[in-house]
Amino acid sequence: MGGRATGPPSRNEGARFESIPKPDGGLRWLTRLDPAGDAEYREAVRPLVGRIERALGPEVLAIRTRPAPGGWHLASWGPARAAWHETLRNITREARRETTFAVADVYDCYGSISPEMIDSLMGPEAAHAVDFLRRGHERGVRGLPIGPDPSAVLANAVLVELDRAIQRTGARHLRWVDDIFLWGSGGEVPRALRALDDVAARMGFALHPEKTRILADRDEARAVALGTRDSSIIAAP
């Protein structure tokens, strides 16, 4: 998952910031909210959770939500990641010889998702979440704060637009946060990549040029999909 090299956010009451190295270089700044801030963010996103979850198809393996007493929680990372790997293995093993494969990745995904984008997509129901994000922005947090579970939910509200763009082309895909694996005919897959580029530009972000490409064949598809280190922002805890 690509991102711009940035320094730490400014001091933020109710939060601390922690840097971790990214597999492709640079640092990723995680936001660690205090209990009050975490509770506020979760409550702000709570009215949106069911609506966002219902919009997601089975092609989305990560950051699925489940109801819980008094709120919600994210489905366990381990089983979801195992399902991702198993599904990719099955796809690459069973695909016809003429199948075309591709991968795509959103550049600086969380940092590119602005409060205004959430407001535009989710409407008045998102007012509290948008206000929370704007207050974070005033303290130097770009886009969605990386780390808190509610950010993952809001990311899916935006990234589902990429799912829809792919589906309109006839290509098929799986998505793990903003990491996308596509397959289909030699016409469908290039068309899907163009559609992704168009919808990303329209929404205000971009595909990562080094991580978005058509793959040479089934062997490369298997190697790329299953053989690389997990760079997801919701990698295993």
Q: Language model features by range: what are they?
A:
Residues F17-E43, E59-S76, G136-N156:
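Short, conserved non-catalytic motifs in the polymerase core
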Residues A225:
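PAPS-dependent sulfotransferase catalytic core
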Residues M1-G26:
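Non-catalytic, polymerase-adjacent accessory regions of viral genome-replication enzymes
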Residues T228-R229:
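Catalytic "initiation/cleavage/transfer" segments centered on a nucleophilic residue
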Residues A75-V177, F181-V199, M203-E210, I214-L215, ...:
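Conserved polymerase palm-domain catalytic core
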